[in-house]
Design a protein with these regions (language model features):
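Active-site neighborhood of phospho(di)ester-bond hydrolases with catalytic His/Asp-centered motifs
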Residues: 54-57, 75-81, 85, 89, ...
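Cap/insert and terminal regions of metallo-dependent hydrolase folds
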Residues: 192-272
Length: 272
């Protein structure tokens, strides 16, 4: 087990429920693939209650549109780390919000939650990608937040950011999301097995876990199927949802075969 930093039932496809006394939360998985976008999968992307977006992959705009979601409706963007498949869509997201907003006279503010240095990195992407087009959006309609925990205003959610085991140069982190009803979702970002995830999983209803590599790859930076199975066995109370998948989708013919996982583990597909 690596040191880091160096159960709720599923309703239909994507409605995550706590116990009967809790409110319903909607989680849309707009993409479930790893950085290689395996056949039938776009880059991993999750949207909570239509307002909280976790990461911004290069294809974020078609992913949102396919789900019938307007980029202007996103209130909060949570960045897990700096890898391109998690951040290179940021200029496109901002471009749409700035120039194709339903009401350009009432363009909305986006709260971006990152680690220190995020403002500089993401602003540079915008300057290189669309010079002269996004300066006002970055200055006037983007709120930058480097706090490690806080309230996601207007959503009913709060968050706690924590370090995970991934490529150190990307400053990798996950997010523990707590709803006002008590429902807890642990989004682990990109990470291999690590103590920070283990400790938080014990008190989480739902765990969104990546499975970025096949079993013949033993990497400290990603989970493989065997490690996902072991994780689920250690935390039988939690609903384990698998994303950032190395394998093809069920209806694709090429790419790595979809691994067999126990029924209690939900191996997600795009659109779930």
């Amino acid at each position: 087990m690596n040191e880091c930093g160096e159960g709720a039932p599923l309703e239909a496809k994507h409605q995550v429920l706590g116990p009967p006394t809790r409110d319903m939360a909607e989680v849309l998985f707009l993409g479930t693939g790893n950085a290689f976008s395996p056949p039938g999968r776009m880059h991993a992307l999750a949207l909570i209650d239509g307002a909280v977006l976790i990461d911004s992959p290069p294809t974020v705009l078609p992913q949102l549109r396919r789900a019938g979601v307007s980029p202007s409706d996103i209130q909060h963007l949570l960045i897990t780390h700096w890898h391109a498949d998690h951040t290179f869509g940021f200029p496109f997201l901002l471009l749409d919000r700035e120039w194709l907003a339903p009401d350009r006279d009432a363009r909305k503010t986006l709260s971006v939650h990152t680690r220190p240095g995020g403002r500089e990195r993401l602003s540079k992407l915008c300057e290189v990608g669309f010079p002269g087009s996004l300066e006002d959006a970055l200055r006037e309609r983007t709120v930058w937040n480097e706090d490690e925990s806080g309230i996601l205003k207007g959503t009913g959610w709060s968050y706690d950011r924590f370090p995970v085991s991934h490529t150190p140069e990307t400053d990798p982190h996950g997010y523990k999301l707590i709803h006002g009803s008590g429902l807890t979702i642990l989004h682990c970002g990109d990470s291999g097995p690590c103590q920070e995830i283990e400790e938080r999983a014990r008190e989480s209803d739902v765990v969104i876990l990546e499975m970025g590599v096949p079993d013949f790859v033993d990497s400290p930076h990603h989970h493989n199927p065997s490690q996902v199975i072991s994780f689920s066995a250690r935390h039988p109370h939690a609903m384990v949802l698998v994303t950032h998948n190395f394998s093809r989708s069920l209806d694709s013919d090429s790419g790595f075969e979809v691994p067999e996982l126990p029924d209690e583990i939900h191996q997600l597909n795009d659109g779930d």
